[in-house]
Amino acid sequence: MTSSTPTPAPAPEAQAVAARYARRDAAQDAQHYSLYASASALQAQQERLRTWVQLWRAHGWHNLAGLHFTEVGCGSGGNLHDLVRLGAEPQRLQGLELLPERAAHARATLPAALSVHVGDAASAAIEHGSQHAVLAFTLFSSLLDARFRTALAQQMWQWVAPGGGVLVYDFVVNNPRNPDVQGMPLAEVRRLFPHARLHSRRITLAPPVARRLPRSLVAPCASLLPFLRTHRLTWAVKPAQPS
């Protein structure tokens, strides 16, 4: 990371996020989100990746060479792996992760040239205007403090170069079974990035539904039942010229 004046983050919310993750059932998460074991997770990942590519190609990015990317909340590195497979250069990628054990897993599996940093992203030292894209996948829904969420979004927006953007993937409705998350409808993404041009797609068959389907029906139902899509992938673009 390059240096800039960091924006201090409210430590209590970062600590609260870590505590929420500690309460989760790690074994159940591993089963639900395994691309090998879960047909619904594999379908969701493939659909998300196709939509991601469509949004960026429509933006005029026909390849990713020479572009700089940061993922906030990179977890075990799955999206960073996808970026490498899409043609991004590892030395131009970095991940920020709050939880040390997840960051360690990412470092163990990602190319050595790719940097993974542990800590609170809101205080990360990243030069303003240095990133072509910042990724936030199921990040904002984990931040229940609206002021913290807004401050982090503003920080991420500062990192983005004109003509780049923030790629947000999150669910749009509240999960009544999980009080540790909050739905992120398009209106909230617009509030977080008020100066962005938003390009958004509704995707991802509701996971509780998808997990109950036979493997052969997951992809057809994801395509044919748009009213059961629970997530959005939104490309929030920073104008190349001030409006």
Give short role names for the model-derived ranges.
Residues 1-34:
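N-terminal, positively charged/glycine-rich alpha-helical extensions of SAM-dependent methyltransferases
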Residues 45-65, 82:
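Conserved alpha-helix/loop element of class I SAM-dependent methyltransferases that forms part
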Residues 65-75:
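Conserved class I S-adenosyl-L-methionine
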Residues 70, 78-123:
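Class I SAM-dependent methyltransferase SAM/SAH-binding core
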Residues 126-134:
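A short acidic, Gly/Pro-enriched loop at the edge of an enzyme's catalytic core
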Residues 150-162:
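A short glycine-rich, Lys/Arg-flanked "PGG" loop and its adjoining helix->strand segment in the class I
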Residues 163-170:
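Conserved beta-strand signature within the Rossmann-like core of class I S-adenosyl-L-methionine
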Residues 181-196, 201:
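Short alpha-helix
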